[in-house]
Amino acid sequence: FLFDLVARQDGMEPGANEYATFNHFSEKLTRKGADIEAEWLSVKRLFMALEEWFVDRRLYHLVGFLIWAGADVNELRALAVGATKREFREKLRAQVLAHTFGVGADASVTAEWIADRLDAVNYGPGSQRIRGILLLFNLATLLQNAKSNMRFQFDSFKTANWDIEHVRSVAPDRPGARKGQIEWLERCLAYLASADQGEALQAEIQTFINLPPKEATDAAFDPVYEKVLHHFQENDADEADNGIYNLVLLDYATNRSYKNAVFAVKRHRVLSLDRDGVFVPLCTRNVFLKCYNAQVDHVMFWTRKDRDGYRQVLIDILHGFFTGGWIHG
């Protein structure tokens, strides 16, 4: 990796062939007057620079975000040339701003400015931008506390396939096929049984699950479905939306399995993953723990107050990230 970066800095085209880096140095070091020690020194300097980026917690997260966003390491190194560490951080932060909101460093970033842009973000085409905002929210949350030594697990984030998940399912997520309906009801039934809730509802769910396939029609499913939504207070479709304040990052496997589950079932699953040591992004965990609502009344419901609290924290954290001096603290 190090030799590849040095060779590319010398002008080698990336991805030419699997031996391109070897051939580059072989040709360069066999030239008359080649300075092998100077070449080795350039490799060591690169290693020291990358090590500094890793050790410095703020650089680690800034560089990590930009590399995830597709930035070239050598281009980031070029930003550091002739710059103090403080100036380098500012340049990196400007790059993050450009990637996230498509504006230059001279933009007047106020809390209202952030709010206007986040309010306009909706689930759909261009989901990579939403991933970027939610990833940055996690990184900025970690960075705001200078005393914390927590680091975002970029390795886990890179190796797993990460999806955008609705905190509260939207109306079109109603399970359609019988298999999906059974799985959806079984998850609700398991939650109700573990929480010792809704005995009558449990019985109705079990009755539908036991129906012969010919009798398990949509007409039979819909009344049970509506009763489950009513129990979990998710029968008001207007409360759920595709805005970013109803979205979090979740691993692909969990998202595909639980995408249309009620909030309480999703919450139980996410907290189970966290307890088992499976990587769950901090802010996803905070959302399902309802950390962004100062007055938590019902942990198994996702309410308008929860959404509004999430919105305010997201705005505040990103505003602080782009304007706060704590990034240098």
Where are these regions (language model features)?
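Flexible coil/loop and intrinsically disordered segments
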Residues: F1-G329
